[in-house]
């Protein structure tokens, strides 16, 4: 008898910033996005840090990481929006969670990864003074491949 709907198939097309496993895991979803530039936006897969200037006592306020900032979390894929605006609440994936990210080139399993500033990519080429964001769980063969990454913000900054 043929199955009408396969609940265990892995045929859902992954997107940058989407959870690879346990998409219904508890997540920190009440972070407020801040930027001094009111027209700035963030997208799934962007890495965020806690805002050092926040005086909010109700929930975390986050801003986009610079290349040397150690992340607090990564913006999770949301099928309802392409980008989040300043002042909106965003969900963040945290250390230990496995997400889909875009490779800058060939990456081997187990490689420590850094974000490439100003792009959507992660790479295993260590750049001095750049923060690590996690470890490759699957292999990438070329630039643009989606790979599974176990987020680990405790790896610190290179060099």
Which residues does each predicted region cover?
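Surface-exposed, low-hydrophobicity beta-strand/loop segments enriched in small/polar/acidic residues
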Residues: 1-159
